[in-house]
Amino acid sequence: GGSCGQCKVHVKSGGGDILPTELGHISKGEAREGCRLSCQVNVKTNMEIELEDEIFGVKKWECTVISNDNKATFIKELKLQIPDGDSVPFRAGGYIQIEAPAHHVKYADYDIPAEYRGDWDHFGFFKLESKVDEETIRAYSMANYPEEEGIIMLNVRIASPPPRDLSLPCGKMSSYIFSLNAGDKVTISGPFGEFFAKDTDNEMVFVGGGAGMAPMRSHIFDQLKRLHTSRKMSFWYGARSKREMFYVEDFDGLAAENENFDWHVALSDPQPEDNWEGKTGFIHNVLYESYLRDHEAPEDCEY
């Protein structure tokens, strides 16, 4: 507990002193106003607390897996169907929590396309197993945007142990998610979130890499397809090689349709077969060197 910082509440009375485990997520100003992490507050006497209105809109759904496809070597796009007649009233940039039961998963049973299996074999991942004897809950940002109704779409990277020590435990939730197939049932709850766009006219700069694509896609699609914003927007995405790039056609299409939007990719480890002539290196460095360094007012952008 105390690691994600997502369970903030305002304690009006009771609850004792704030704990060291909370201080990494709560500023001094927030602490003075009674902000606490609910998972760290021991209830020993009567307390008075204040919750955000959004908390009361949280629900639980049993969803059906529509598809669970690799979008990159170690990233799957999990698409879930919400029960008929229902919807998740989320905002772009929000997230859900997904539940995994106790399970024993063998990586050898995963459905990994041929184009990606070489790396899985190389690192010895097909020898791995994940054994979990208790329910697990984890949070994932949604990759879809609100007008993509009736579904939840997640980008999930497998949390394998480092290749140099495969004896370390596998990621409990990602190992479970990679084992899911069309038709399987999955329980989620939500919506949650604080990573929402501000309603201003300021320029928007989106930066992400790997499975960090999810909230970027949600925000950018929402701004351009639902809100039809005229705000200047750019998306800077980092990947290892061309094989690790995904949603390329989607973003190319958005850039062609919206003159206020452009997107850029930098590869940190382009392969010879990529014939890559674009930007290389880590995306945050590329963003600074090729754009923000000469930007007239980078402090006015929203990131």
Curated annotation (Swiss-Prot):
- Reaction(s) catalysed by this chain's protein: a ubiquinone + n Na(+)(in) + NADH + H(+) = a ubiquinol + n Na(+)(out) + NAD(+)
Query: What does the record note about the cofactor?
Result: Binds 1 [2Fe-2S] cluster.
Spans annotated as Catalytic: 201-303
Any single GO BP term: sodium ion transport
Q: How does it assemble?
A: Composed of six subunits; NqrA, NqrB, NqrC, NqrD, NqrE and NqrF.
User: What residues form the membrane-spanning segments?
Assistant: none
Q: Which residues bind [2Fe-2S] cluster?
A: 4, 7, 39
Give GO MF terms, alphabetically: 2 iron, 2 sulfur cluster binding; metal ion binding; oxidoreductase activity, acting on NAD(P)H, quinone or similar compound as acceptor
What is the protein's known function? NQR complex catalyzes the reduction of ubiquinone-1 to ubiquinol by two successive reactions, coupled with the transport of Na(+) ions from the cytoplasm to the periplasm. The first step is catalyzed by NqrF, which accepts electrons from NADH and reduces ubiquinone-1 to ubisemiquinone by a one-electron transfer pathway.
The cross-references to Pfam families, in alphabetical order and at most eight, read: FAD_binding_6, NAD_binding_1
Q: Where in the cell is it found?
A: Cell inner membrane
Q: What is this protein called?
A: Na(+)-translocating NADH-quinone reductase subunit F
Which residue range or ranges hold the 2Fe-2S ferredoxin-type domain?
Answer: 1-45
